Amino acid sequence: MDRETKLRGLMGLCVRARQATFGEDGCLKSIRGGGCAVLLLDSGASKATQDKYRGVCDNAGVQTALLPRGLLQDATGRSGVAMAVAPGGLAEQIRQNLPVEGKEEHGQQMKSENHGGGASVE
C-alpha cells in the first residue's frame, strides 16, 4: 500500500474517531490551545491562508504538511483547506506516512514541514 493510500485511510479514521478539527476558527483554536499535533493543509488554499496557518503553527511548534489539491476533501468527505489532528496514536501514524519533502507521489508534490512539534519526517 502506498503512502498516499494509507494517509487517506488514516485521515478518514481521524474524522470517525473525532480526532480531527476543521474550519478556520476550530483549527486555529486547536493549534493555539495545544490540541493539534499536525496540521494538514490543502495545496488549493491561497498563499495567504497557507502563510497564516504556517505562522500560527511556527509559534505553537506544530508540524504542517501540504497535501495535493483535493486530497483532504477526498479522504475526509469534508470541504475545507485545513485539518488539525489531535495528539495521539493517529497523529503519530499520520506523521509516519507523510511524504518526504520534495518527493513526488502520483505526479504531485507533497511537502511536510516540522516546526518543532514532534518527530521529523524522513
Where does each model-flagged region fall?
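N-terminal first-folded block
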Residues: 3-41
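Short, ordered loop/turn segments at secondary-structure junctions
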Residues: 25, 44-45, 69-71, 88
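Hydrophobic alpha-helical segments that drive targeting, anchoring, or assembly
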Residues: 17-22, 46, 77, 88-90
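N-terminal positively charged helical leader segments and presequences
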Residues: 32-54, 59-63
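C-terminal structural segments of small proteins and small subunits
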Residues: 71-111, 120
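Catalytic cores of RNA-modifying enzymes
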Residues: 1-5, 9-10, 15, 92, ...
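Mid-chain, well-packed structural core segment of small domains
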Residues: 54-80
